[in-house]
Amino acid sequence: RGITYFEDKYQNSFIFYAVGSKLFKINLKDGEPDLSFGNTGYVDLHIGLGENSNSLFVTMTSPGVIYKNLIIVGSSVSEGNPAAKGNIRAFDANSGDLIWVFKTIPEIGEEGYESYDDSNAFRRLGGANAWAGLTLDEERGILYAPTGSVSYDFYGGDRVGDNLFANSIIALDALNGKKIWYFQTVHHDVWDRDLPTPPVLFDYKVNDTIIPSLAQVTKSGYIFLLNRINGKPIYEIKEKDVPSNSKLVGEVLSKTQPIPSFPDAFSRQSFTDNDINPFVSNNERDSLLKVLSSISKEDVFSPPTEKGTLIFTGFDGGAEWGGTAPDPVNNEVYRNSIEKAWI
């Protein structure tokens, strides 16, 4: 869904784009592949995803970013199992060589490994991928990657724990892939609450102090405002008690979820009988009321159940894809909002 422009030190112009599991580099002068890049003009996007990934689905739904002589990419992978890992990778934009990898599902001894109760979970889990795109602070050399959930989307009995670095904004040194900071927006996601857009960067004024900031919008209708240098919240982000009494075998949900104290949610946070379209027929209304009365809908983080759970806003809700546009002059952020209920 996009291309990445690159100009080498000789002022030659190229574009990168992905088709299937291949990242191509094309010479803009003649439209031909750059044969010196990777394998005669492309690199296999399975590279850097670990053992046994070659047969798994992987592509890119958003273009990569250029930093110096690197093309840095996220990926789109399966939302069920088996799924490839969502590692963030940087390739040499000239040769196609793999330069660095950040593992979004930590392995033994790596930070975040302890966020999975099963010590072998990393061997079989996939996902935690940055499908929505990446953001670069070129001046500071910081890459920001918004990740989605670990697969499966709606059951986490095989991945008990908070599941780092899924559902997180991850700040990386763009030159070497080393983590600078992270902030997790959903613990142990079983609601498909992937971060749906790249964060936007802007200077935010608070009490006459200018803060280099980052705004990350979510499917749930929240905006997380963070200092983009150190990842600290600009306003308090509270750990709110949420329903955690899952009846699914093996499932252990987080007892709290992070909720920004400011700004208020930009999407409605509940769907009641009164929200049914007033223009539907009486028969349709009765049918909808029957469905709503039979499913779980106590909270935006209601535990998934075998009988059904209301997800509102839905799997493609909040600010999915549309993203945000900052107005630093007026200290405002503009965003779209999708309000669609799913079961």
Predicted regions and their residues:
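Short, surface-exposed beta-strand-loop junctions and turns on beta-sheet-rich folds
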Residues: 32, 80, 151-152, 232, ...
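Glycine-rich, aromatic-lined ligand/substrate-binding cores of catalytic
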Residues: 195, 295-343
